[in-house]
Amino acid sequence: MRRYLAVRGGAGDVAEPDLNAKPQDNLYLAVNSEWLSKAEIPADQTSAGVNTELDIKIEKRMMKDFADIASGKEKMPDIRDFDKAIALYKIAKNFDKRDAEKANPIQNDLQKILDLINFDKFKDNATELFMGPYALPFVFDVDADMKNTDFNVLHFGGPSTFLPDTTTYKTPEAKKLLDILEKQSINLLEMAGIGKEEARVYVQNALAFDQKLSKVVKSTEEWSDYAAIYNPVSLTEFLAKFKSFDMADFLKTILPEKVERVIVMEPRFLDHADELINPANFDEIKGWMLVKYINSVAKYLSQDFRAAAFPFNQAISGTPELPSQIKQAYRLANGAFDEAVGIFYGKKYFGEEAKHDVEDMIHNMLKVYEQRINDNNWLSEDTKKKAIIKLRALVLKIGYPEKIEKIYDLLQIDPERSLYENEAQMATVRTKYMLDKLTQPVDRSVWLMPGNLNNACYDPQRNDLTFPAGILQAPFYDIHQSRGANYGGIGATIGHEVSHAFDNSGAKFDEHGNMNNWWTDEDFAEFNKRVGQMVDIFDGLQYGPAKINGKQVVGENIADLAGLACAVQAGKNDNVDLKDLFENYARSWMQKQRPEAIKTEVQVDVHAPQPTRVNIPVQCQDDFYTAFDVKPDDGMWLDPEDRITIW
């Protein structure tokens, strides 16, 4: 066992406050313990912390704006398709109408599943079901070809399981969670007009099919290997896997043109597809579709349905209360028209001065990154040159998009129809839009995140960075706070996203976003050795009631490590106070979570829990030891040979 395993992450438990903690022993607790000792988690949230507070701040602003615009107190902004968001919001917040409608809006669509009396009927109606608001026991998507990202291709995979991850089925909580889902689903089906005994049989069949799925679909750890989703097979080879279901006929009816090949995201699922999708399993498939359907649509119905669909989510998240009705109305409208809403937010709350300042910081960080690549002591010159070509090709998307994606023009809201009917109609439009992309080149101008989102991302297939206006505010960024604090906040975030271009997944893609090996064999072997060190230092780390899977979170941890290293270097170039930088970095990950939420996050998220993302990256920065005079006997000490450097 390596020495650092005793002290990785500092002394103490970052899930518990320690008012006596010193930065030399546990930076995260030294900075955040006072807040942790007093913080209360909102009743409708899974956590409290910097990110939650920022999410709530954005949401409160937008909810007031929506209320004022919907009431006529404020005029409708001149933003394309924003009026549709307000129209949907008005429908969603009318709970008098929703409560009066009860289960009526879903009866026709529910009946379409109930009318499936055998496997032949399922096959005959599969196209209509796929285009509607239903889950089928397989998934198709259209996205860029990883090896030629100018073109879209058809992707195939398995459906999601009832529990958050395949690993959840092996935990002591699995039976309790499935029992809650069983009771909830029977109740919902009864509320929709199905007899109790009939509902019970449907749900038991659904649970049986879900167990079969859980053995063949990918876990979160497997999904974290991004390049492993690229498994192209010929159409002939793909169709040969389906003996019982007429996949050839199905694809003819849903696709705008014939495809020559399919990208199989889950080869194991495809190998078992015929064992799952066949006449012998029909009753289980039908039950599974009903349970998926009723649990997904309950949120569009009455308050009674909303409440009846809450226990399973409550058990997974620990959240004691449903979001308020008005909050749900805003969230549904924002979710359906997020790009228009994000443009509204960006134009109103994100100033040009701030945008230019952030752009300046990003360009500074890119210069630092290039210098760090040049100074790298384990890469060959050939690989360095190619890494810099990729770095210089990065496309920046800051604040909010200038144009709205075409899909929002196609979505229509009918104020005379129910909330469910509007949502179902939009689901059909989105599915058709997705399939139609097969005949079109990849649109690289599309944003993956709306302007009002508190987040940021790197897209390996477009080689672009997105920094929405939502994250470009305190404590991550404030034009009035110290430059050191800004580098510890948004600077580290910028470095983090840039580093995704060179993490264990991004490193396999070139400057055009194509999966293409631009490394020498020797360099890639050394890179993978360092990736392995990153896996080891996090693997098994205890956080509250859960242990971290180092392999599952390694890509994000590489980005954290390299992002902070770049922020420190950029800060030094600007002569900032490094204590400010490290302390704001620790503050930016401040969080208090419910135990249930921790367990679920560790199972399903490729990010380590936020508090665990502070001390280990900091421990690997030599400048931290100088800034805080850290000694070998201190809890934050790592021996120099155990400090990991990748970029």
Swiss-Prot record:
GO terms for cellular component: plasma membrane. InterPro entries: MetalloPept_cat_dom_sf, Peptidase_M13, Peptidase_M13_C, Peptidase_M13_dom_2, Peptidase_M13_N. Its EC number is 3.4.24.-. The keyword Protein transport does not apply. Binds 1 zinc ion per subunit. One of its GO terms (molecular function) is metal ion binding. It is an enzyme of class 3 (hydrolase). The active site is at E497, D560 (proton donor). Zn(2+) binds at H496, H500, E556. The keyword Isomerase does not apply. Its cofactor is Zn(2+). Belongs to the peptidase M13 family. PANTHER family: FI17812P1-RELATED (PTHR11733:SF167), ZINC METALLOPROTEASE FAMILY M13 NEPRILYSIN-RELATED (PTHR11733). This is Neutral endopeptidase. The lineage of its organism: Bacteria, Bacillati, Bacillota, Bacilli, Lactobacillales.
